[in-house]
């Protein structure tokens, strides 16, 4: 008998706020999910990337293989998602809508929600996460700190992991380390040796680090 397989299904949902825009996404689902943890993935810079970014897809598939329901989606103005890009000003409303859609998936466990952002997506996730109590942990990949030169309006106090490239040209480690050190709550940094900002060619080590962190988080009671 063939082993159960992961399913990948396109979905449409709406951003929060007014006007509300229809957004497109892909849900990765493990076989027969029951109280499955949920991950929502935010892709890099909309001008040059989308939800089909190699690292984003690999993370979603690997998390589904690990038993999570994973949703990756296109920000407004990207692909078939309606609206216009706003360079991070309104994209947090897209993430809010994506979380709503992800938690409505059959078998989803609303008490175990992880948000993962890559580059621009990490910036959007950092902006939004402190305002949504449903988010239990946050993973930021290649966070572009230059976008928040004056800091973030609020900070996420729950567990968080920062995955960074050894040679990140937009957010070097010497800038990321003091930023993370000053954040409240549990936090950690994972350096992907040899990688640059977008992790091209280093997706494997990045995915491995993220899946390991998520598995540990899933098994933490009350987190």
Tell where the protein language model's regions lie, with residue ranges.
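N-terminal cap/lid segment of alpha/beta-hydrolase-fold proteins
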Residues: 1-37
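Short beta-strand/loop motif that positions the catalytic acidic residue
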Residues: 156-157, 162-164, 168
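Short, surface-exposed "cap/lid" segments of acyl-processing enzymes
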Residues: 32-74
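Catalytic histidine-centered segment of alpha/beta-hydrolase-like enzymes
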Residues: 83, 195-207
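Alpha/beta-hydrolase active-site loop
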Residues: 55, 85-106
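Gly/Ala-rich beta-loop-alpha elbow adjacent to hydrolase catalytic centers
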Residues: 117-125
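Acidic catalytic loop of the alpha/beta-hydrolase fold
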Residues: 166-171, 197-198
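Catalytic histidine neighborhood in serine/cysteine hydrolases
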Residues: 182-198
């Amino acid at each position: 008998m063939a082993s159960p397989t992961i399913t990948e299904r396109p979905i449409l949902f709406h951003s929060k706020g007014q006007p509300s825009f229809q957004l497109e996404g892909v849900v990765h689902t493990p076989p027969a999910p029951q109280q499955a943890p949920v991950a929502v993935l935010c892709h890099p810079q909309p001008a040059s990337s989308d939800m089909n970014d190699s690292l984003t897809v690999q993370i979603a598939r690997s998390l589904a293989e690990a038993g999570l329901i994973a949703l990756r989606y296109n920000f407004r103005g990207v692909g078939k998602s309606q609206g216009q890009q706003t360079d991070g000003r309104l994209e947090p409303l897209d993430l809010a809508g994506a979380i709503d859609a992800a938690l409505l998936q059959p078998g989803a466990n609303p008490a175990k929600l992880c948000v993962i952002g890559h580059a621009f997506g990490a910036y959007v996730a950092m902006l939004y996460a402190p305002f949504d109590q449903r988010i239990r942990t946050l993973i930021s990949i290649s966070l572009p700190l230059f976008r928040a030169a004056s800091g973030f309006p609020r900070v996420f106090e729950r567990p968080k992991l920062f995955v960074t490239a050894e040679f990140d040209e937009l957010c070097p480690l010497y800038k990321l380390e003091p930023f993370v050190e000053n954040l409240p709550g549990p936090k950690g940094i994972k350096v992907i040796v040899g990688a640059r900002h977008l992790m091209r060619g280093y997706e494997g080590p990045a995915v491995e680090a993220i899946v390991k962190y998520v598995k540990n988080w899933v098994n933490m009671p009350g987190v």
